[in-house]
Amino acid sequence: MKTPLLRAIVICFCVSFASGCASSPEDDPKLTKQIFDSGVAAYDVKNYAEAFRIFSSIDDRDVAAMRNVALMLRKGEGTAKDPKAAEEMYARAAQGGLATAAADLGDMLLKGEAGPPDPKAALPWLMGAASAGHPVAALEAGQILEEGTAGPKDLATARKLYQIAADAGMDEAKQRLAALPPEPAALPPTEHP
């Protein structure tokens, strides 16, 4: 009689213990935010090695931490400069929905920081960030489309992108917008008998 009761108690204890263990710190958004904030604090006082360590500890579950790791890899802050690893980390954060990471990745590809400049590869990342309202990405994507460096020129889309950046207060976008040729006048509809 004691054996089944003891076994039931042990099973209940194990189930309770296991369910309590299933909730790890990785599952706690508040803890992740506290860790992230401590990384920001370390970065702000230029303790880059500590900031990099902190952001790296949560980069598997926080896209902003991924982006910060990428930025630090890009600049060589708190770690060795590694543009290729920065691009990979920016891509992960951008795929996680962070427009800033998409803008940063597009900028790196456009400038050729990890290889030759590649406006064609940069354009989709910049367009994604621009569609989320990122003004620098809108300006850079507009330039690519205005100049036709990634394919055919597209002045109509460049104009829209420059407008996004100009609306955010970017003077260069305002100047580029003003320098574009006027939009072609719409032709009146043709009537057919």
Regions found by a protein language model. Give the residues of each.
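Hydrophobic face of amphipathic alpha-helices that form TPR/SEL1-like repeat modules
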Residues: 35, 41-42, 57-58, 66-75, ...
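Alpha-helical adaptor scaffolds
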Residues: 71, 75, 84, 88-132
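Structural signature of tandem alpha-helical TPR/SEL1-like repeats
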Residues: 45-50, 80-89, 116-125, 152-161, ...
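Terminal, low-structured helical/coil segments at or just beyond the last alpha-helical repeat
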Residues: 152-155, 159, 163-193
